[in-house]
């Protein structure tokens, strides 16, 4: 089962985290579910984030990417693939 790992970083430490089941290509829905569970606003997803996520399976959102104020420094998301298939990094 593939998962999306959502981390809320404050002062260079993981303040909160959530693992959400996530098939490849459904990261927006999984991120929305994680944001709801963590009770944080949904970030603005830019082309920069899409490119980073597709290339590295990882991206980060800072306070510039949220409409509302946030109680953390940044949100990092990472796709964890447990299917055994290797992706080129």
Language model regions located:
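Short, extreme N-terminal segment that most often corresponds to the first beta-strand
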Residues: 1-19
């Amino acid at each position: 089962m593939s998962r999306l790992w959502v981390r809320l970083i404050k002062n260079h430490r993981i303040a909160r985290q959530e693992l959400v089941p996530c098939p490849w290509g459904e990261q927006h829905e999984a991120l929305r579910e994680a944001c709801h569970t963590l009770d944080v606003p949904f970030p603005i997803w830019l082309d920069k984030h899409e490119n980073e996520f597709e290339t590295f399976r990882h991206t980060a959102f800072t306070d510039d990417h949220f409409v509302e104020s946030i109680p953390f420094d940044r949100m990092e998301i990472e796709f964890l693939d447990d299917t055994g298939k290797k992706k080129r990094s």
